Amino acid sequence: MVKQKINYKSSLAYYDIAIFVKDYISENTVIVCIGTDKCIGDCLGPLVGTFLKESSFPLPVYGTIESPIHALNIDNRINEIKKIHPNASIIGIDACLGDTKSIGEIHTRDYPIHPGKGVGKSLPDVGTISIIGIIDSSDSYDFFTSRSIRLYLVMEMSKVITHGLTHAYDLFLD
């Protein structure tokens, strides 16, 4: 298993994401962004999905602020996506909890996301590969009510991931 840790503030963060993702991206790739806008800490995925859609990203993107994929609908939405794209390679994107020193890191991994794991939920794995953004500490008393997560952090990390995916697609075309 390969995992790369990238600080979102690095000027080359988008490039590091792109270099990793380019080896997995193809015309048969689908982007699945997990989370909800009902919680600042959980909106990283839907923000990435929204930014990709707004930029006319050429690959299918699921999970946006308007139409999120979250704990209550993930089973149905993933089944729908797999029916529409039966042979697709999926890149899963989600927010994650981690150590305090890891907040602000973006991890690119050659294995799926385990959504809900950090908050004790058992949901289906998503993705052939995954990109997670660590937005808060797992030491926080309650992820869903934590007031320490800044929307600015989530927005900036979402922009970096979006830029990385866009650049990865450009590298794939070259």
Model-derived features: where do they sit?
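N-terminal catalytic or cofactor-binding beta/alpha core of small enzyme domains
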Residues: 1-174
